[in-house]
From Swiss-Prot:
SUPFAM superfamilies for the chain: Blood coagulation inhibitor (disintegrin) (SSF57552), Metalloproteases ('zincins'), catalytic domain (SSF55486)
UniProt keyword list: Developmental protein, Differentiation, Disulfide bond, EGF-like domain, Glycoprotein, Hydrolase, Membrane, Metal-binding, Metalloprotease, Protease, Signal, Spermatogenesis, Transmembrane, Transmembrane helix, Zinc, Zymogen
Tissue and organ distribution: Expressed specifically in testis.
Location of the motif Cysteine switch: 186-193
Function: Sperm surface membrane protein that may be involved in spermatogenesis and fertilization.
Residues passing through the membrane, by range: 707-727
Name of this protein: Disintegrin and metalloproteinase domain-containing protein 25
Source species of the chain: Mus musculus (Mouse)
Extracellular-side positions: 214-706
Length: 760
């Protein structure tokens, strides 16, 4: 292969440039058209015409439920019985496999470039593994009904797909053809000579010499991917571009599964299909790589920004499977590769493409000293069935990652990865609502699939929308969450709650702290959050000793590849140091707890190293005090005067507080903007409160309470009265002594006798 770029020798190259300028941008009239087309594919296996070595087994995937922690993290478990035993698969949805701004480029018969932005379901691709076998692989999709995809167990690959016309969720499991899944004579086209030439060519390119980044601790990285599918591969799918897309999505899901061990996430930004003719000639694989890279640099890069771009070709290259530039990721002129796709074994294709992308990421072919638990790994020169990276591949990757700036970017799930599409579940400009999929819209009482409100509906979403109607003014739509926050109320006209406002930065809060960005900042409280309720901020000697070291355990920030030592005035603004720690806390992955004995004090802290994507819990928070009238801002101890504001309790007539927009938030009984007149309180930013309604409600509740209390007392008195009557009746009915009878004429004599007797 030539070491310098040469002009294209392919026909119509000049026409391509002119044609690329005439892009026809279109939108699909009905967004669910793509879904209906793709659903047709459920009758055809995703692996195309792949051969199988045995008759299929019928299985019924059964969902397994229970109290396992992994389910709380989005993992699902299913049991499948095949191969004479029961298997449990753990799967998790792969979010953002396809960009929300995903574009498909095709060509008209006249040669005009046609752009579509179809709705693509993005939560139905799953990756995972078999229970008890961390080396296994599961890559399936549920987008088209049931499970369709690949299961790899102990080096054996199975295809799973739904059984047609089954009413009991039956699936078919096939064992893939062994001649495609075991060691083959096919190999990567990268030879030692070509590798040397590529290195020489790249070393001469100054764009490859990016900033050195010693000490980088690698974690999550993101790669924007663009793909091109040449004419013959589209013909293989009977010119059905929807089938091509399904194949592409499934392959990317498999590759993402392979690269998960490196914590690399691929996001597909776009696909270009050469459905009319190829725009470069397909001859030898070396020439194709050169010409594709040149075409990409002058054409594709302007349509689909990418970190890596590959072309899928349905063409024989002898024994060669693919070719890619080494260490070329992030370099627009060389970050490309060629992949040969013949037949329909998508797992086989996934290994090929993952191998060639490995070259883009700096990985060379494995030598005899490289290992991945077996002697043959993914980056072996000849293809094999083991999609695992070796220790050598890891080393090459780390070296490339240290200089590959495009990989060290924040995830683009927000922002440019989202296009304006009705039906994607996100309300864009010009849409009254967006209920998402057809099923979701069928269940939505307020929104139509056309992203307009249903008859009688005034709203479909928002904190001030209830049962498709706007809530009345004065309804609380956002309660305060802490002492540094302020409430908001609906205004009666909008379905949206007013913007969140909170106390002005610098407002005092508990334990001598200050409010800053809606939180009360205090080092003692920060230590409690990390190490438990008994912990507290350590002695100043801990801060002085550790934060002046300038390492990952004590520093005042990072510039490029170096930790900054804290100067003495700023030691309280570096990393928080704690004491009185009773137990080591449970922290997220990649977190480190350290302790140091210093002059009879044990100083506790956490580290935060390069490449971590989780929040840093151990850095002293901005707004924390660092001395009299001083606070920490950007790891510097600065005067509290930076919070000087025209708003103060005095400007609020001492009847309110200042919010973060420097406006008065008045107490109950005073009216904004300056709390000078009687009113309901609140601010010009919070919406109108309805304290009267709240007072009436409280009064009503109080009245109800008094009524209840009255009836309770009445019942008690009634019981006491009944008891009193019972005892009174018992007393009246007690037996009493007989009284002397009054003598009558008939018994007069007898009476006298008795009386005489008694007197005697």
């Amino acid at each position: 292969m030539q070491t310098t770029q040469r002009a294209s020798s392919f026909a119509a190259a000049e026409d391509n440039i002119a044609m690329d300028k005439a892009v026809v941008y279109t939108r699909i009239p009905h967004l669910y058209l793509w879904l209906e087309i793709l659903n047709i594919l459920s009758s055809r296996p995703l692996t195309g015409y792949a051969q199988h070595t045995s008759l299929p087994e019928v299985v019924i995937p059964l969902r397994v439920t229970g109290n396992r922690p992994m389910w709380a993290m989005g993992w699902l478990t299913y049991s499948l019985h095949f191969g004479g035993q029961k298997h449990f698969i753990h799967i998790k949805a792969k979010k953002f496999l396809v960009s929300r701004l995903f574009s498909v480029f095709t060509y008209t018969k006249q040669g005009a470039l046609h752009k579509d932005q179809p709705y693509v379901q993005n939560d139905c691709y799953y990756h995972g593994h078999m229970d008890g076998d961390p080396e296994s692989m599961v890559a399936i999709t549920t987008c088209y009904g049931g499970f369709q995809g690949i299961l790899q167990i102990n080096g054996t690959v199975y295809e799973i797909k739904p059984k047609n016309l089954s009413s009991t969720f039956e699936h078919l499991v096939h064992k893939m053809d062994s001649e495609e899944t075991e060691l083959l004579p096919m190999r990567c086209a990268l030879t030692e000579e070509i590798a040397r030439q590529m290195k020489l060519q790249q070393n001469e390119n100054p764009t490859l010499m990016q900033s050195h980044y010693e000490g980088w601790w690698t974690h999550k990285s993101f790669l924007d991917l663009a793909l091109v599918v040449e004419r013959e591969r589209i013909r293989y799918h009977n010119n059905n571009t929807s089938r091509v897309l399904v194949e592409v999505f499934t392959i990317i899901n498999i590759i993402n599964n392979i690269y998960e061990t490196l914590d690399v996430e691929l996001v597909l930004l776009g696909v270009e299909m050469w459905n009319e003719r190829n725009h470069v000639q397909v001859r030898s694989i070396e020439e194709l790589l050169d010409e594709f890279c040149m075409w990409k640099a002058r054409s594709l890069n302007f349509r689909i920004p990418n970190d890596i771009a590959h072309i899928f070709v349905n063409h024989e290259f002898g024994i060669y499977l693919g070719l890619a530039y080494i260490g070329s990721v992030c370099v627009p002129s060389h970050n490309c590769g060629v992949d040969r796709l013949l037949g329909g074994n998508l797992f086989y294709f996934g290994r090929i493409i993952a191998h060639e992308m490995g070259h883009n990421l700096g990985m060379e072919h494995d030598s005899s000293s490289c290992t991945c638990g077996t002697k043959i790994c993914l980056m072996a020169p000849a293809d094999n069935g083991i999609p695992k990276f070796s220790n050598c591949s890891y080393s090459y990757y780390w070296a490339t990652y240290a200089t590959a700036k495009c990989m060290r970017k924040e995830k683009k799930s927000k922002g440019i990865l989202r296009g304006k599409l009705c039906g994607d579940g996100v309300v864009d400009d010009g849409e009254q609502c967006d209920c998402g999929s057809a099923k979701s819209c069928a269940d939505d009482p307020c929104c139509k699939p056309s992203c307009t409100l249903k008859d009688g509906a005034a709203c479909a979403f928002g904190l001030c929308c209830l049962y498709c109607q706007i809530m009345p003014a004065g309804t609380v739509c956002r309660q305060e969450v802490n002492e540094c926050d302020l409430p908001e109320w609906c205004n009666g006209h909008s379905h949206k709650c007013p913007n969140d406002v909170y106390l002005l930065d610098g407002s005092p809060c508990r334990d001598g702290g200050y409010c800053y960005e809606k939180r009360c900042n205090n080092r003692d409280e920060q230590c409690k959050q990390i190490f438990g309720k008994e912990a507290r901020s350590a002695d100043h000697s801990c801060y002085r000793e550790l934060n002046t070291q300038g390492d990952r355990f004590g520093n005042c920030g990072v510039i490029r590849d170096a930790y900054l030592r804290c100067h003495d005035p700023d030691i309280l603004c570096g990393r928080v140091q704690c004491e009185n720690v009773a137990h080591i806390p449970f922290l997220r992955d990649h977190s480190t707890v350290h302790w140091t004995h210093l002059n009879g004090v044990t100083c506790w802290g956490t580290d935060y190293h390069f490449g971590m994507t989780i929040p840093d819990i151990g850095i002293v928070k901005d707004g924390t005090d660092c001395g009299p009238e001083h606070v920490c801002i950007n790891k510097k101890c600065v005067s509290k005067s930076i919070w000087r504001s025209q708003c103060s309790p005095k400007t609020c007539n001492m009847k309110g507080v200042c919010n973060n927009l420097h406006h008065c938030h008045c107490n109950l009984g005073w009216d904004p903007p300056h709390c000078l007149k009687s009113g309901l309180g609140g601010s010009i930013d919070s919406g109108p409160p309805n304290y009267t309604e709240n007072y009436t409600e409280k009064k009503h509740k109080k009245s109800i309470g008094l009524v209840i209390l009255f009836w309770i007392l009445f019942a008690c008195f009634s019981v006491l009265f009944i008891v009193f009557l019972f005892f009174l009746r018992s007393y009246v009915e007690l037996p009493m002594s007989e009284e002397p009878k009054v003598p009558t004429p008939e018994n007069k004599e007898d009476t006298n006798e008795v009386m005489n007797t008694e007197t005697e």
